[in-house]
Structure formats: C-alpha cells, structure tokens
C-alpha cells in the first residue's frame, strides 16, 4: 500500500508540474503570434446579388459574404494570409 500511495503521489506531482508549466507559458511566439495571424474584418459597404447572379457593391480588397440564399450581404476583407506559404512554395 505504501508503494502504491507513493507512486500515486509522484504521478499527481508530475501532472501538476506539467499543468503549471504549460499554464505559465502564455507568451505569443512563433506562428501562433497575433502579429502573424490572419485578420478578417467587415468593410464599410454592403453588397447585393444582381439578376445575373453577380454580386455587386464591394470594392478594393473586399468581397461579398452572405448567408444561405440571401440576395443581400456584407463586404469583408481578409488580410495576413500572404505571410503563409502556399502549397506550391512547399513543393
């Protein structure tokens, strides 16, 4: 019984140490850093689907997003994805 109890104490201490070590490392580093992250934001304009099925109203880097079969949507812009390699660059 004593050996089993001692073993369980050691296991609990190791688990607690691992948890505390990982909980203390909240720094943003590497590819998960917020400076390297992809950012999505809404543009100032809305968009609509024309009778020809082409979406109108977004300009610049913005594109139209909509829900389901709605003919109205909101313009959105995504930035930061150019910092990541493409599948062609990895080959």
UniProtKB/Swiss-Prot annotation:
Organism of origin: Ixodes ricinus (Common tick)
Organismal lineage: Eukaryota, Metazoa, Ecdysozoa, Arthropoda, Chelicerata
Subcellular location: Secreted
Glycosylation, residue list: 46, 69
Disulfide bonds: 43-62, 47-64, 58-75
Function according to Swiss-Prot or TrEMBL: Salivary chemokine-binding protein which binds to host chemokines CXCL1, CXCL2, CXCL3, CXCL5, CXCL6 and CXCL11.
Signal sequence, renumbered to the chain: 1-23
Record keywords, A-Z: Disulfide bond, Glycoprotein, Secreted, Signal
A Gene Ontology term for the protein's cellular component: extracellular region
GO molecular function, one term: C-X-C chemokine binding
Name this protein carries in UniProt: Evasin P1077
């Amino acid at each position: 019984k004593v050996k089993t109890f001692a073993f369980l104490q050691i296991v609990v201490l190791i688990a607690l140490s691992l948890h505390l070590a990982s909980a203390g490392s909240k720094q943003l580093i590497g590819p998960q850093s917020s400076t390297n992250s992809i950012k999505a934001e809404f543009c100032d304009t809305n968009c609509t689907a024309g009778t020809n099925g082409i979406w109108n109203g977004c300009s610049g880097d913005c594109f139209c997003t909509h829900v389901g079969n709605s003919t109205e949507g909101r313009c959105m812009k995504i930035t930061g994805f150019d910092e990541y390699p493409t599948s062609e660059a990895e080959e």
